[in-house]
Structure formats: C-alpha cells, structure tokens
From Swiss-Prot:
Taxonomic lineage of the native organism: Eukaryota, Viridiplantae, Streptophyta, Embryophyta, Tracheophyta
Name under which the protein is recorded: Chalcone synthase 1
Gene Ontology biological-process entries: flavonoid biosynthetic process
EC number: 2.3.1.74
Active-site positions on this chain: 163
Catalytically driven reaction(s): (E)-4-coumaroyl-CoA + 3 malonyl-CoA + 3 H(+) = 2',4,4',6'-tetrahydroxychalcone + 3 CO2 + 4 CoA
Amino acid sequence: MVTVDEVRKAQRAQGPATIMAIGTATPPNCVDQSTYPDYYFRITNSEHMTDLKEKFKRMCDKSMIKKRYMYLTEEILKENPNVCAYMAPSLDTRQDMVVVEVPRLGKAATEAIKEWGQPKSKITHLVFCTTSGVDMPGADYRLTKLLGLRPSVKRLMMYQQGCFAGGTVLRLAKDLAENNKGARVLVVCSEITAVTFRGPSDTHLDSLVGQALFGDGAAAIIIGADPIPEIEKPMFELVSTAQTILPDSDGSIDGHLREAGLTFHLLKDVPGLISKNIQKSLTEAFKPLGISDWNSIFWIAHPGGPAILDQVEEKLGLKPEKLRATRHVLSEYGNMSSACVLFILDEMRKKSAEDGLETAGEGLEWGVLFGFGPGLTVETVVLHSVAAA
C-alpha cells in the first residue's frame, strides 16, 4: 500500500510554473483621450459644469493615455441615462451588461489557447478574475460554457479584487500548477468599466480621476509546470510570489458596490505610499537571488496612473526604458485594472522577439511584476525569463 507522503510527491510537478501563452482582447469601441472630455460632459448632460470640465481636461492631458477601449458606446449610454447620472440607482442596468459582456470579453482565452497549441480538453483549472459585477453561477461558469471546456475543469472565481489582482492570479496559478502534476491552468482577467462609469460631481473629484483613467480589456494566459518539449513554449517562469498590505494605507483606494454601481475612492498620497514602500518589497523578493540592482531586471508594474510610475522611477533611480512596456500599455489602453500586467507581459515578450533579444524579458534573465490596488495591497511576483528557442 502506498503512503500519503508518496501520493503527495507523485501529485507534485518537478519544475516551476511557467507562462506558456498569452492572449488579449478589447471591445471594438475605441475612445480618443484628447476628445474624451468633450464627449464625456456631453453624454452625461454636464456641459454647464465648465470649471469641472477644464479640470477633467487637465486630468486627461496628464494621464499619459492616448486611447482606451470601452464597451459603453454613445448608443448604449443614450438608452440608459441612469448610468450617465452621478449617483442614480443603476445597479440592475449595469449588472445586466457585465454579466454577459465580462465572460464574452474573456474570448482573449481563445487567443491564448491557440498560441499554446494544445487541445482545450487539456485545461485542468480555470482562474477567472473581474472587478466588474458579481453573479452566480459566475463568469468562470459562463466562460467554461462559452469555450466548451470540460465540465470537470476546476474553477476559481475572484470578484471585486481590484487593480492588484493581476499579481494575485499569477500567485494562485503558480500554486495550482506546481502542486498538481500535469495541471494546465487557464487564467483570465476581464474588466469592463460599465460598473464604474458615471457622470461628474464637483464634490467627488476622486470619482473623476477614475473616469479619466479606466479602460476595458481582457487578458488570458496558460500556466503549467514541466512544459512538453517541442510542443509547449515557456516564456516566463514564476519563481516566487508575495502579497502585503502597506503600512498606514487604510482607505487609500476603496471601491464600494452600491445601488449606483461600483463607486471608486482614492486618496492623493497613493503614489507616495507605493514609492515609499516598494524598495522593501523588492529587497525581500530578490535578496535570496543576490540581486539589488533594480536596473538589471525587467519591469512589469501595474500602471495605476502616471504619478505612480514617475515616483517609483525616481525613488529607485530606474532608467526610463525600464518602464517602457508599462507606459506603452497605459498609453494604448488606459488602466484596465487586473488585466493590465498581463497586457504588459504580452507587450514585452512581443517587443523582445521583434528586437531579436535572447529572452522574452527584454533580453534579461530576471524580472519583477507588481500589482497595486485596494487595501493598499501590493502583489510581488519574481519572474525568470526563459531563453528564446
């Protein structure tokens, strides 16, 4: 008879979890950031608020965002004026949209599965993450049906985590892949701003910040350990993960589900809190590897906004090119909450291949991925870039 210890050993993978494929998707509706203030104040019937509109224009100008993608079109908003008001009861309307559209945007998974090159029947686990809406059965169930995954796929649904969750899903997928031999984990982050969109208020400027930054997008990755040679192509190994709540950060980023949808609250010192504490997270993550030069690693940081990136860059003395991929994704898509860091991974590996570099991590061996969000919570993931075949 076998022992429990022998069973446990047999269940575990030999190598580290690796990212084998990445896919992304956005709604077709693209909005230009330079013209967005005019559109936003017109569609919300707020053109009389001229001073506030000027403030919003400055926010959009400073956002470093060129364009964003949004499910909410002018037609949809005209049909649902309660979504355009500042705090009108509108949760039912919003829920009706996101319950359908969040899993549908998860079609990014189709791209990831295609790149992976294995039949979808080999997916053993699904981790689905969204801050857009809540439902039972969840978006994980709906996506399983949409993709035609096996009914026995082991699902984990994460709702209402916020912007740090791109790191959380990697942490969970790493544990699943390494502790279940042969596991292939499909991870999907799908975010739609239909839950947070609302008209302006001159008494709640933090809500306006969200209107200037957030965009819609979904990203999917396939994670597994012990890749099959010649069939699966590993890009990044997930070496270690950590999560922490920053000191003295209570209430710095909050979101509350109300009759008016998901409300967003932000303190001005968020960039300061992150930049003040980031060195500690880096030291704890990289000390075991003997790395202390933050310019010697590749960077994937959740782009909460340009001020966070600027202050992190300044605090750590990072060269401008270190946050190139991060700033590129912010510029092209805005802040897509949990999906952002996965978009940045995709951008980095594509540009690295384009430039003929030796690894998917800008030619470097080691890298870091940061998620920042409500709490204030920080997720840290140490990545090892696999040499290009």
